[in-house]
Amino acid sequence: MSEIFRPPVSRIATLAGHRDAVYALTGGAGSTIYSGSADGMVVGWDAAEPSRDGELLARVENSVYALKYLPALHMLVLGHNFQGIQAIDLAGRQLAHATALPPVAIFDIVYSESRQRLYAGLGDGTLAVLTVPDFRLEKLLRLADKSLRCLALHEGRGELAVGSSDALTRILDLDSLETRFTLGESTNSVFSVVYSGDGTRLLTAGRDAQIRSWDVATGYGLVDTVPAHMYTINHLAFSPDGRYLASCSLDKSIKLWDAATLTLLRVLDRTRAAGHGTSVNRLVWPGTENRLVSCSDDRSLAVWQLEV
């Protein structure tokens, strides 16, 4: 039996400047990342050169939970809680579009290149659909009585996974927005949904601290349940090469897993890896340098280097 390779991981930088908890992260072009926080600041960083100061791109009145980079338009879309969607033209460093939404929190944003549509999960259980590039509100669809917390696209199957605080994950048809499947094994709020790079699996996680793996081809049959953290799992993210899965939690830790087997490889916490001291809220794998970036309630971002 071959020995499991557990890649060494070290914290190589701290990105500081936010004045409150950092909730949102998204990758941009190359090694660029963007962060958003409870202080309403949206900041751009270079994960390849973490010694460089961040660049303030926007400051809005309320908190920011969701960010999405649109490469074809070179725009950064932010969810301005209780206000709506804003799109920043990154070339001109200016606001290009602003679309009002119901006055609730905006928890996640995804973009379908094939449909030219932006989807936003709202705090009142509504899915907002906007057309791109004009960012016109096309539809508001009430899916649940509780918050829609996370979204993931499967472009190949034309499906949208929606995790919510009613403990359900709904799989919608991207065109009709009708529910194809409902996944009900979670025992509490679903905070993260992510498809594997090859599109064969959907992973879900949330307040019950377990990672569940679903087989897409068999109609989302449950294939594995892993007790992964002590407390709420806030986010899951696959590495660009598909080899690793990272999870982060209210328990202040980041965990690195073998993506194929969900075997635990590393725990990145305060004691073992100079990790965050409070809840870790979101993760992103920028660029191609085997780097992982996390953000936390401690107002900072951490840059982690994998030696693979």
Where would I find each of the regions flagged by the language model?
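Residue-level detector of Asp-centered blade-edge/turn motifs that repeat once per structural unit
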Residues: 28-30, 71-72, 113-114, 155-156, ...
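Conserved strand-to-loop turn within each blade of WD40 beta-propeller repeats
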Residues: 36-39, 79-82, 121-124, 163-166, ...
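Short loop/turn segments that connect beta-strands within beta-propeller blades
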Residues: 47-50, 89-93, 131-135, 174-177, ...
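WD40-repeat beta-propellers
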Residues: 42-46, 86-88, 127-130, 169-172, ...
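Blade-level signature of beta-propeller repeat domains, shared across WD40, Kelch, NHL, RCC1
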Residues: 279-308
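WD40/WD-repeat beta-propeller blade N-cap
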Residues: 15-22, 57-64, 99-106, 141-148, ...
